């Protein structure tokens, strides 16, 4: 571990104190206050209650683990359930509130699938590496924050994260097209199998970096190194640390879709911070963290407030995109714990952005409903699980100064691992299944909006203008 880790808590506390004082000059929200730890905890509790109103998997006749969907049955694809549980695990970690822990555990275990690798058969027709990766990252988070372990006869958090990583590291998912890298979709029959993208590889990179640190295992770190290098070499990440969406294998990944999404930056930024920590402060990873951090602030914050450049100006965001700001806040916060040199720059920024987030949570019916556009200062009538998850992540992570940094198996981690997890998965020769219209329109995290890059909203990004 880097020698700076020992002074991390005091440094973060000092920066947070400054940030809270600075935020006092900002107009406070009508409903939520975040001026003190008690205020933050109270606001986070209300936001957690609000976001869980969108979840019905713990009700009779419903499927545990998923938000209503997929379309046309509801707004949400399978992956966003996994993302929700990550937000709720962080909520517990920062606040200590155990209200939803049993619901989270049931949800996370219900969706593991028969091979305990987060590939349940009922989502095969829209299963992407990124979808699986989000569930794997939530399992990894559970291990890192010592979220209560499942019963001994159930899959364990660390083993689930390893299973996801192992299935994605299998040679069956890494072909020679475009010089390597993961495809977006997993089954060859799926729409999008011919597309390689940043988020699929970013989730894999992120998991590899975190497993390397947690287990002190160089094999995972080698995969993380290799993945970062490939993403740069193929042009998905440019010299200015802009991360683009992806490209098709038929063009050898030369037809890069230049859409930029904040969760791509966030997933790579957190992974790079873990690599910095694992390598005991290697200057290569420090430079990468700094470069990507500056790019993230440059591209995805307006006046120090989180902003989704691909879609927010004209509100063309898909349901998926409406959840990205929360990952930015949550993962940048964790970065300050494992790469403490970033704290002085990041924590005041996130405090300002969180204040803007709660300022607009004034919607009906009770004046606490959150919208999506934080820079406007007013409620924008855009409501949903993603919008509320965003604010929950932004608010709860303000308590980082009193939270323990992610643990490892050498520093108090309790989750049991399995280096062979996922090895029994038949994950690369899936029998083709009929693809429905709904699957074609929106399979996985990135919807047909990405593959349909001719849509007017994305013309300027596709042409680099």
What function would you assign to each model-found segment?
Residues 102-106, 110-208:
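Extended ligand-binding groove/face enriched in aromatic
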Residues 201-215, 219-276, 289, 293-296:
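Active-site cradle of extracellular carbohydrate-active enzymes
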Residues 2, 9, 18-42, 49:
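N-terminal signal peptide
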Residues 95, 139, 146, 208, ...:
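Long alpha-helical scaffolds in large eukaryotic adaptor/regulatory proteins
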Residues 32-130, 134-136, 142-143, 149, ...:
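CBM-like carbohydrate-recognition segments
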Residues 249-251, 257, 284, 307-313:
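Membrane-interfacial loop- and helix-cap regions that link adjacent transmembrane helices
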Residues 43, 99, 103, 153-156, ...:
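Alpha-helical positions within canonical tetratricopeptide repeat
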């Amino acid at each position: 571990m880097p020698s700076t880790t020992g002074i991390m808590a005091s440094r973060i506390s000092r920066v947070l104190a400054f940030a809270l004082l600075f935020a006092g000059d900002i107009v406070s929200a009508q409903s939520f206050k975040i001026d003190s730890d008690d205020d933050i905890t109270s606001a986070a509790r209300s936001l957690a209650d609000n976001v869980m109103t969108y979840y019905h998997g713990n009700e009779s006749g419903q499927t545990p683990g998923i938000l209503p969907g997929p379309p046309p049955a509801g707004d949400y694809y399978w992956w966003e359930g996994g993302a929700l549980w990550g937000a709720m695990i962080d909520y517990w970690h920062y606040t200590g509130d155990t209200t939803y822990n049993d619901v989270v555990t049931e949800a996370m275990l219900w969706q593991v699938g028969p091979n305990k690798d987060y590939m349940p058969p009922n989502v095969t027709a829209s299963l992407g590496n990124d979808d699986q990766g989000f569930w794997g990252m939530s399992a990894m988070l559970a291990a890192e924050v010592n979220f209560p372990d499942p019963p001994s006869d159930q899959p364990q958090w660390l083993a689930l994260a390893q299973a996801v990583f192992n299935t994605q590291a299998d040679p069956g998912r890494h072909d020679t097209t475009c010089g390597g890298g993961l495809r977006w979709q997993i089954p060859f029959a799926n729409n999008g199998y011919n597309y390689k993208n940043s988020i699929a590889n970013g989730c894999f990179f992120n998991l590899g970096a975190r497993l390397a640190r947690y287990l002190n295992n160089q094999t995972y770190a080698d995969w993380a190194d290799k993945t970062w290098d490939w993403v740069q070499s193929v042009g998905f990440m440019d010299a200015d640390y802009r991360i683009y969406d992806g490209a098709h294998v038929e063009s050898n990944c030369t037809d890069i879709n230049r859409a930029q999404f904040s969760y791509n930056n966030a997933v790579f930024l957190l992974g790079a911070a873990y690599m910095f920590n694992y390598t005991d402060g290697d200057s290569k990873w420090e430079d990468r963290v700094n470069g990507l951090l500056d790019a993230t602030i440059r591209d995805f914050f307006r006046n120090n407030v989180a902003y989704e450049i691909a879609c927010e100006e004209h509100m063309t965001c898909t349901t998926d995109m409406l959840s990205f700001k929360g990952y930015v806040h949550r993962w940048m916060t964790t970065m300050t714990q494992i790469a403490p040199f970033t704290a002085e720059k990041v924590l005041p920024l996130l405090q300002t952005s969180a204040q803007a987030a709660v300022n607009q949570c004034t919607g009906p019916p009770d004046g606490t409903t959150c919208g999506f556009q934080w820079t406007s200062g007013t409620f924008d009538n855009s409501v949903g699980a993603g919008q509320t998850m965003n604010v929950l992540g932004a608010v709860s992570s303000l308590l980082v100064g009193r939270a323990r940094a992610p643990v490892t198996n050498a520093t108090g981690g309790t989750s049991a691992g399995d280096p062979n997890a996922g090895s029994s998965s038949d994950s690369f020769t899936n029998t083709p299944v009929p693809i429905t219209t709904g699957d074609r329109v929106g399979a996985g995290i990135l919807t047909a909006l990405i593959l349909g890059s001719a849509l007017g909203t994305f013309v300027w990004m596709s042409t680099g203008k």
